[in-house]
């Protein structure tokens, strides 16, 4: 369903009445409608993926903004479209594949919704014999929702990797692994499928090209993916040894001493306008401003490729 949010809930309700699960790209659906639809879907043995869900792979078939990756034995559930895209492409690059990647919408793990679709999809992944390893990706859930999910995953019959972007885990549990970055989550999942550790990625850089602290240069990061922006802000703060709490005001994940990380896919920038994965006009405008700013040392971007992107 991809129509204005004011009408999307009604169409989703009709689809459920017809015995159909719903993939809802529409945003601006009230959280009350979201909860009601998901409760109805649960009672019927169906699922509502969304609202504001832009990515999915079902039995190897891509839906919406998705990459053409190999089919395999890793299942993913995510409250993050670009997070799912990044995970699936890294898994594919490492030589493994994905059977199902289910987007649940960014609000499913809020207290008001209670993780209804997440819990149902965990059950579905456990019942699916083609799934050998499960990966969960989202921003940190509401505490009561997190406790419920963690209790369920602790009794999951297959290895699980969780990534709550912004948290820095310090330990793993038996058959229950906790990742810090999307790359780590993908490598853990691939390693669990193969039964062997996958080495970390390495990047060779020429430090002579680095700016010095006294140069006073800043990072301007303009992202189309919310999870990728969140991860970039987290890693930049870590590198700067900065304890500033996370932001999410009008898409700003970081604003510190001239350094900015912005999610241009935030609702603040997409009201009545295409998402930047479809139309990069807003990002081009921001990039020009950054280039014109003499303090800019680095312009940082994500480039989301795949079906539906930058069409």
Region annotations inferred by a language model:
Residues 1-311:
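Catalytic-core regions of core metabolic enzymes
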């Amino acid at each position: 369903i991809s129509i204005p949010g004011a009408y999307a809930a009604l169409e989703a309700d009709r689809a459920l009445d017809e015995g159909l699960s719903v993939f809802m790209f529409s945003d601006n659906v009230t959280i009350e409608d979201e909860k009601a639809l998901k409760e109805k879907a649960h009672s019927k043995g169906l699922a509502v993926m969304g609202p504001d869900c832009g990515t999915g792979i079902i039995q190897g078939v891509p839906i919406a903004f998705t990459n053409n990756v190999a089919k395999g034995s890793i299942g993913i559930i995510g409250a993050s479209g670009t997070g799912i895209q990044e995970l699936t492409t890294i898994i594919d690059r490492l030589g493994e594949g994905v059977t199902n990647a289910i987007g649940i919408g960014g609000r499913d793990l809020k207290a008001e919704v209670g993780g209804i679709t997440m819990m149902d999809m965990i059950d579905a992944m456990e019942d699916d014999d083609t799934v050998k390893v499960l990966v969960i990706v989202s921003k940190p859930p509401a505490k009561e929702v997190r406790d419920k999910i963690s209790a369920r995953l602790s009794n999951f019959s297959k290895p699980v990797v969780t990534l709550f972007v912004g948290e820095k885990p310090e330990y793993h549990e038996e058959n229950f692994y906790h990742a810090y970055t999307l790359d780590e989550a993908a490598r853990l999942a691939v390693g669990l499928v193969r039964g062997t550790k996958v080495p970390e990625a390495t990047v060779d850089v020429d430090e002579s090209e680095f700016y010095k602290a006294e140069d006073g240069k800043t990072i301007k990061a303009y992202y189309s993916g919310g999870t990728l922006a969140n991860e970039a802000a987290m890693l930049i703060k870590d590198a700067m040894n900065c304890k500033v709490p996370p932001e999410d005001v009008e898409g700003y994940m970081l604003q510190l001493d001239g350094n900015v990380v912005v999610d241009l896919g935030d609702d603040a920038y997409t009201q009545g306008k295409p998402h930047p994965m479809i139309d990069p006009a807003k990002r081009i405008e921001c990039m020009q401003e950054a280039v014109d700013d003499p303090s800019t040392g680095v312009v940082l971007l994500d480039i989301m490729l795949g079906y539906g992107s930058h069409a």
